[in-house]
């Protein structure tokens, strides 16, 4: 329903957008009413199993309330401590990792990515599953190729916010790594981010191509600067908003060097 509402909006179908938006919200309310136990999501109505993937799907589509997020983070953390594995195959992995990054659990995602080591060691493409290489488990399969989507979007923080990347959202997840460099080729040109953490300070460089604009979303950013000076007064920075739980920065095309305290 969410995707249908977005498609209707693009097509100028206001009635369709409203209809699908209402259906999406009704479904969300029912999921929260009937498929939640102790703050996490049930696998189904008939049983009270709470596999992490059930909560991951809910997080991916924005079902939980903000008040549920601490309990959901705890749910994933406890599952990882207990098993050091999520028992999720190729198909569900994309949803699992997206939920981990959305909940700022990048360190757990980084550790779980180690299951790709045997594919890399064999110098082959992404297999259908994470089992041993065999005639039935080889070749390039989209089920396990999702790091090519997940890592640029969440570690690099780059995702489209307008048609043809006319607008870009920059929202890196800094938890779990010390540095990252990312570039994404678009019809507008190459969007680049690189960041590193040192002594409690995060340094974030951004490059946006011509005729594009960006919204940078950071954790609450103390001592925010751009190019060594005030971010609010920096050329190309249109607005800086300090909101509950995050800092938003509107920027135009160009190159930026932000720094802030974590």
Go through each PLM region and give its residues.
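Catalytic cores of carbohydrate-active enzymes
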Residues: 2-139, 143
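Non-catalytic C-terminal accessory modules of carbohydrate-active enzymes
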Residues: 10, 22, 107-262
